[in-house]
Amino acid sequence: MPELPEVETVRRGLADRLVDFQIGQVEVCRERAIASPGGSALFIKMLCGMHVGSWLRRGKYLMASLHHEIAQSSADSEPDPDGGWWGVHLRMTGQFQWHEAISSPCPHTRVRIWNKKNEELRFVDTRSFGQMWWVPPGNAPETIITGLQKLGPEPFSSAFNSSYLSKRLKGSKRPIKSALLDQSIVAGAGNIYTDESLFAARIRPHTPSGQLKKVELERLCNCLTEVLRVSIGAGGTTFSDFRDLEGINGNYGGQAWVYRRGGQACRICSTPIRRESLCGRGTHWCPNCQR
């Protein structure tokens, strides 16, 4: 599943490509891709004619403001979305493609959106778990996209710090990796970046969360945000399905310290990286560097 860096990469691509984008036509190729009340019929009706404003990311969710007229943003904000919100979750294999010329859709195309110039934004999803929502104007996105209600703080926010983690993890016996994967504790982290950040922080993924000291939690917070920052700069990670809006792979995978490097020598100490299942997730770690 695309994690925070991959979703942020997509957000930036959409923000760049969809400047002054007015939706002229929408085609839903698979009904289950639309998760909001009213299904595809209402989704199509309410998006057609709308101007797409700012793209936001919350955890692994994407949201675009919709406007009846072109949104004239100030330095600090843009007008309220009088057309509501357009929400997206890529899930396992969802990806956006940009097509300037007319082309036939592949079998896994789920939603097609054209502007007035007949340029197409295409949503392709092999596993068909990706979802879209239309949120009516005047409603907070989380009232319709209910998964937003459960999200913890963003890793880059001031709310995510060692004091916060210490309170949330106090007395917990579950492995720290499992805690980091919990979206109600920190939004956006997934299997790749939990492995990478725990390695950077020199913490074993099996360590009971509640046993970590304040200094270790502070180091973990710093390492997680730094790993995410580096991956965003590399355009995310591609091991299978992820591509950005232009079809380009993410480049972080080649820089990974432990993820998908089971059996290979640790880049720091040359100890073979271990791969095992922890809490049902493939987990990579160095038994020498992480104690």
UniProtKB/Swiss-Prot annotation:
Where does the record place the catalytic residues? 2-3, 60, 281
Binding positions for DNA per the UniProt entry: 108, 127
Chemical reaction(s) catalysed: Hydrolysis of DNA containing ring-opened 7-methylguanine residues, releasing 2,6-diamino-4-hydroxy-5-(N-methyl)formamidopyrimidine; 2'-deoxyribonucleotide-(2'-deoxyribose 5'-phosphate)-2'-deoxyribonucleotide-DNA = a 3'-end 2'-deoxyribonucleotide-(2,3-dehydro-2,3-deoxyribose 5'-phosphate)-DNA + a 5'-end 5'-phospho-2'-deoxyribonucleoside-DNA + H(+)
> GO MF annotations for this entry?
8-oxo-7,8-dihydroguanine DNA N-glycosylase activity; class I DNA-(apurinic or apyrimidinic site) endonuclease activity; damaged DNA binding; zinc ion binding
List zinc finger spans: FPG-type: 257-291
Q: Which UniProt keywords apply?
A: DNA damage, DNA repair, DNA-binding, Glycosidase, Hydrolase, Lyase, Metal-binding, Multifunctional enzyme, Zinc, Zinc-finger
Q: Name one Pfam family in it.
A: H2TH
Where is the secretion signal located? none
Cofactor mode of binding and number, as noted? Binds 1 zinc ion per subunit.
The prosthetic group or cofactor this protein requires is:
Zn(2+)
Q: Which domain of life is it from?
A: Bacteria
Q: What is its EC number?
A: 3.2.2.23, 4.2.99.18
GO BP: any one term = base-excision repair
Q: What does this protein do?
A: Involved in base excision repair of DNA damaged by oxidation or by mutagenic agents. Acts as a DNA glycosylase that recognizes and removes damaged bases. Has a preference for oxidized purines, such as 7,8-dihydro-8-oxoguanine (8-oxoG). Has AP (apurinic/apyrimidinic) lyase activity and introduces nicks in the DNA strand. Cleaves the DNA backbone by beta-delta elimination to generate a single-strand break at the site of the removed base with both 3'- and 5'-phosphates.
Entry-linked NCBIfam families: fpg (TIGR00577), PRK01103.1 (NF002211), PRK13945.1 (NF010551)
Assembly and binders: Monomer.
Q: Which family does it belong to?
A: Belongs to the FPG family.
User: What is the protein's name according to its record?
Assistant: Formamidopyrimidine-DNA glycosylase
**What is the taxonomic lineage of the source species?**
Bacteria, Bacillati, Cyanobacteriota, Cyanophyceae, Synechococcales
